[in-house]
Curated annotation (Swiss-Prot):
Zinc among keywords: no
Gene: rpiA
Record field: catalytic activity: aldehydo-D-ribose 5-phosphate = D-ribulose 5-phosphate
Regions annotated as coiled coil: none
Name used for this protein in its record: Ribose-5-phosphate isomerase A
Keywords linked to the UniProt accession: Isomerase
Role noted for this protein: Catalyzes the reversible conversion of ribose-5-phosphate to ribulose 5-phosphate.
Cellular compartments per GO CC: cytosol
Pathway: Carbohydrate degradation; pentose phosphate pathway; D-ribose 5-phosphate from D-ribulose 5-phosphate (non-oxidative stage): step 1/1
Family note: Belongs to the ribose 5-phosphate isomerase family.
Length: 226
């Protein structure tokens, strides 16, 4: 089974968790897109809270009613992808440059389910470069401070994310620095250190937020819990 098929079946399994009347957080990325498509096919009376403009556009095209995070007291269920799923369902997210809105939606949710293909499940976080969202003003200086923190944790200095069109800018108008790491031995300590840097909006370490994971594998969908 291809990685894309594994993403698809995990997204379809997650869509079965949604019940009529729910407020549902809609994740961002290729795996989350499969969930949004499967959810739309069920034609339930729900409201979606998108984590990016890209997801909002897809949901509208598919006929899913949307609402803003500030217009709901809480979110019943959020389903989102991840770049890596490590021990205890610790996650690296942010490959789609939507980590800030994703984390805001996750933290407002009663239940969070992460979906992914089997390759995303790792023994130790860090092979995927850690995204860090940074205020655009003075970001070069912020990047230098991040490099100092990286050195403290025996990690490589972060790099400003670029695309064919130039610097990648998030929906919130910020930029992304990606920290190549290889192995993040102390995720909680690194997360705390990154938050001490003025100019850092947030980072892609999602710790103690996921309630379960649905992995698409060649044998079907496998459920993981912390």
């Amino acid at each position: 089974m291809s990685a894309d098929d594994q993403k698809r079946i995990s997204g379809e399994a997650a869509a079965e968790l949604v019940e009529a009347g729910m407020v549902v957080g809609l994740g961002t990325g290729s795996t989350a897109a499969w969930f949004v498509k499967a959810l739309a096919a069920r034609k339930l009376d729900i409201r979606g809270v998108p984590t990016s403009e890209a997801t909002a556009n897809l949901a509208r095209e598919l006929g899913i009613a949307l609402t803003a995070l500030d217009d709901v007291k809480s979110i019943d269920l959020t389903v989102d992808g991840a770049d890596e799923i490590g021990p205890g369902l610790s996650l690296i997210k942010g490959g789609g440059a939507a980590l800030l809105r994703e984390k805001l939606v996750w933290e407002a949710s009663k239940r969070c389910v992460v979906i992914a293909d089997a390759a995303k499940h790792v023994k130790t976080l860090g092979k995927f470069p850690l995204p860090i969202e940074v205020v655009r003003f003075g970001h070069v200086h912020t990047g230098q401070r991040l490099a100092d923190i990286a050195a403290e944790f025996d990690l490589l200095p972060p790099r400003l994310r670029m695309a064919d069109r130039g610097v990648v800018v998030t929906d919130g108008g910020n930029v992304i620095y990606d920290m190549p790491s290889g192995v993040i031995a102390e995720p909680a300590a690194l997360a705390a250190a990154l938050k001490t840097v003025t100019g850092v909006v947030d980072h892609g370490l999602f710790l103690d937020l996921a309630d379960e994971a649905l992995l698409g594998t060649d044998q079907g969908v496998v459920k993981l819990v912390p």
